[in-house]
Amino acid sequence: LNLDEFALLAPQAPGGTWYPYSFIAPDSNNEPAFSNSIEIINKVVQDLFDKGLRSDQIYFIGFSQGACLSLEYASQNAKKYGGVIAFTGGLIGEKLNPAKYKGDFLGTPVFIGSSLKDMHVPLSRIEASAELIKNLGAEVKTLFFADTQHTIRQEEIDWVNKNMLK
């Protein structure tokens, strides 16, 4: 990724995982880890605001659990961000509940890339997440690949570099 002009903050998941079960498991199964993870991200973002950064200077980037958490945090706190880049992820929860998402992305670019047949992230959840995020005012781009790999592809990186990290 073209990140030479960016300051990178990479919070680490406690114990190496943001939540213990699938992102589409019953919500109670992932508590309290899920709420604690959202709070970790919130503290990082609030610290950036306290240091004088604007929301449009903040990008969220993640893969797999990190992608899901990036989409989830940004959608629960929608405003004009620099962008949200999700390499294989979707909104978190057994069922999507539009009532838990608030705000307006004001055209924030959001990228979601994945395999058409990812073993951890169903295509139907990515599509439903993209639709919900669009309804919150984001400009969403999805790229799907015919493989079955749970990975970040060079084509995804190239698209993000060209269109979001210029």
Explain the meaning of each model-derived region.
Residues 72-83:
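Conserved hydrolase catalytic core segment
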Residues 61-66, 70:
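Gly/Ala-rich beta-loop-alpha elbow adjacent to hydrolase catalytic centers
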Residues 111-114, 118:
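Short beta-strand/loop motif that positions the catalytic acidic residue
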